[in-house]
Amino acid sequence: MAISFSSLGDPAPIGNLLIVDGLNIAFRWKHQGVLDFKYDYARTVESLAKSYNAGTIIITADGGSSYRKAILPEYKANRKEKYAEQTPQEEKEFAMFMAEFSNTLTLLKEKHTVLQFKGVEADDIAAYISMNLDKFNFDECWMISSDRDWDLLINDKVSRFSTVTRKETTVHNWDEHYDFEIEDYITFKCLTGDKGDNVPGIPGVGPKRAVQLME
């Protein structure tokens, strides 16, 4: 099933929208050592859609991040170093995992929309759609990801559920997850950086200090 941005939301959708962070969710099975997970993945996604009254499911997949690397060549360079240290067995298992993820996307395409564009990351796709919910005629959107960077997109119509913590993050419980206001999220990330993506912050400024500076 294929939907372009131009046709998304036409005809008027039924229910809410579910945006799935494709690879992020797949790592749930990798961490469990499961390499045959495509059917479990599909069932999980459809179960979540039912829970959140989502009539439309969109699975987003990474297509690279060339424009980010053009700005910061060191972006995610730490991950290459990590993979370079893999043993032959780990390399084999990772290749098998990625192959199964590809099979999973193929399976999901039979019933749902899978969006992947060259040079665009999954969260870029999620950002574009979630910021244009009215244009696409959706009332609410639930993002499925354990990546807290996606919290930048949260507003009164957009929320996130983590399959790792099994917790929801919304505008209504924001203060249960963070010690600063929702509109200060970008400032917080600029101050602290992102170790996972190898993005530096202000030297000597950790999360606690960042919150103090924003008060």
Specify the residue positions occupied by each region the protein language model found.
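Extended two-metal-dependent nuclease catalytic cores across DNA- and RNA-processing enzymes
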Residues: 2-5, 9, 15, 54, ...
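Domain-level signal for Mg2+-assisted phosphodiester chemistry and nucleotide/NA-binding surfaces
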Residues: 2-107
